[in-house]
Structures are given as structure tokens and as C-alpha cells.
Amino acid sequence: MKLPIYLDYSATCPVDPRVAEKMVQYMTMDGTFGNPASRSHRYGWQAEEAVDTAREQIADLINADPREIVFTSGATESDNLAIKGAAHFYSKKGKHVITCKTEHKAVLDPCRQLEREGFEVTYLEPESNGLVDLSKLQAAMREDTVLVSIMHVNNEIGVIQDITAIGDLCRERKIVFHVDAAQSAGKLPIDVQEMKVDLISFSAHKAYGPKGIGALYVRRKPRIRLEAQMHGGGHERGFRSGTLPTHQIVGMGEAFRVAKEDMQKDYDHALALRNRLLDGVKDLEAVTVNGDLEQRVPHNLNVSFAFVEGESLLMSLKDLAVSSGSACTSASLEPSYVLRALGLDDELAHSSVRFSFGRFTTEAEIDYAIEQIRVAVTKLRDMSPLWDMYKEGIDLSTVEWAHH
């Protein structure tokens, strides 16, 4: 068993060997290394053909037209292009945007930028299980609402939003609907014909592809217009200039092809591992699963161990690669903004750990993890005076602490 055990698949996945093998063929003199925009010779044509194949593989996973796929450097860029691009293009119609407080920073920060430019943004409060209440969303919609951005699967708590229902609400009112699907592509079926979604962000590295490549689905019927954010040679039909990185695109295409093929197998594998881990730790007392356990991808388990500091727990679990919060914000010692939005108090939000597993995680690794978690939580609680008070039946919320 390789230590530390990797249980942070929501942060990134290792590249699948099938993907890596394919990518290597598009880099050196022996392979297809040309620029896909070079139209005057075979090196360019072959590279363009490889890009077209990958575009089809990505479109296949979501039942889209390959012409609706725009390559970007990742989901962050896709989110920026979708949110700023749509808001700017449709700003004559209105300047109101709706999103949710538990979105990824790559959605929240572009919304903050729009606010600085004079747009108004409504940040919906999720329910305590992490889901958006459709009636609250409907109530927030106005005549001047031009864009709604709600993620498919949350990166910290793994809950699945009802994208189909939200899409219906938006389509009725002719509001552009953007979805960040970085955490759901390859894990859940996505059908753009059934879901009335206009813009969808994808990332390769969350689906066993390489880092640094992503895509944005831009609906053609009804046609969605965007203002480009990256200007230059007019690549990607003017949506996103910049030489296409053939090897990364090929990697993303292959990763999405494999994901489509293995989706059910991967899902069942993750579900078995998730249940095994939860069964192994849930009797530890004062253990809370954050986010809805039913409407959730099985690849994620976010748990709070009361009376244990999350950072201390991570340091005690040195043989497990896990995170508290998401990798994008875990450098900050603030409690997770996602968990606080669910109504968790700072103590519980601070004591949370996200375990995420995937294609290469084994049962033996989960069993080892359970053993490590049990030892660490018990040891840290033994050192905590708060735990002793809790065990004595003292209601900690009533205690008056002295201020020094």
C-alpha cells in the first residue's frame, strides 16, 4: 500500500494510464505535434483532426453537438468566460445575476467583479442540506435578471442540485443558465438536450485527465452569445483565442471517453467505498455528515468530528491525503464558507474533513483510513476539556467564557 493514501480526488485525480499513453503521442517529433491552426500542411491537419476527435468525445458524454464545445484552460476560465461573457453581452437587457453562496470561488469571484462593474448579484442561501430551494430561486428572479449560475455538484459537500428543474425555470423566463459541472462530469449522466442549460463548465483533471485544460459548452439552439474574455488570433470561433494544446485536448477527450464507458462501474465502486468508510466511523459519537446524504455523489464524504480541530486532525492523519474545505481555500484558516452557509457553527465547520475517493482507491486503503481516523479522533478528544464537559452533559452553548 502506497502511503500517504490519496483520499482527495475532489481536488484532483491522477491521470488515467490510458489517457497518459494517448497524450504522449501528441508531443514529440515522432508523434502529431503540429499546431491545429496550421492549415497549410499535414502536421496541422493531423493535429486538427485529433482536436476534432476530442471535441466529439466530450460532446458525446453530454449529448451535445461538437460545435458547442469551446476549449479553455480549465473550469475556472470556463466559469469566467460564461459569467462575465454572458453578463456583458446581455447587459442591455438587464444587470441582475443570481447565484448561490456555496458556489466555487471561480463563480463567486467573477460575480463580485460584475458587482464592481455595476451589476447586482443575488446570493441565495442554501437549505441546511446544501440544496437550493427552487421557490427561493423563483422569488429572486426579476425582469432584469440575465443570468443564473448554479453548480451541478458541490466540490466540498458533493450535493447534487436539481439542474433540470432550475433549467425549466430559467428557460420559461428567457434567463441564461450557467452550470459549473467540474465535479459532476463523468460521475453523473449529463444530457444537455434534457437539461435546459445554456452554458456548462468542465475540467479535465477532475475526471482523470490532465490539469490545465477544460471546456465550456455553449448552446447553439437557442443560440447563446458571449463576449470573449481572451482576445487574439480568434481561435475557438472567436470565443477563446490562443493556440490549442493538442496533447492536453487529446487527454481530455480520452478521459471523457473512458468516463462515459466506466461511469456506472466508477459510481458503484465509489458508493461501496463511501459506505464502507461511513460505517467505519459513524459510531464515534458526535459525528455529522455535512450535506444531504441521498442527493449526493458517492465520491465525496464530508464529515465533522465535534470537539476535534480540523487542522489538528489533518496533522494527526499524516498517512492520509485529505483536506478540510476545498484545495482552493484550504490555505486559509477561516472555517469553510460552504459549511457556514449551511448554518453550521464555526466549531463544527472547523472540525470538518473532506474525504473523496475514486477509480484507483481500494477497500484496503479505506480500512486503513478508518483505523487511522478512529485512533486520531479518540486521541484528540482525550486531550480536549470541551469533550470532557460534553461527556458530563454540560451544554457548552450556555457556558460563559472568561475574556482575557
Swiss-Prot record:
The keyword Transferase applies. Its cofactor is pyridoxal 5'-phosphate. GO terms for biological process: [2Fe-2S] cluster assembly. GO terms for molecular function: 2 iron, 2 sulfur cluster binding; cysteine desulfurase activity; metal ion binding; pyridoxal phosphate binding. GO terms for cellular component: L-cysteine desulfurase complex. Coiled coil: none annotated. It catalyses: (sulfur carrier)-H + L-cysteine = (sulfur carrier)-SH + L-alanine. Belongs to the class-V pyridoxal-phosphate-dependent aminotransferase family. NifS/IscS subfamily. Homodimer. Forms a heterotetramer with IscU, interacts with other sulfur acceptors. This is Cysteine desulfurase IscS. The lineage of its organism: Bacteria, Pseudomonadati, Pseudomonadota, Gammaproteobacteria, Vibrionales. The gene is iscS.
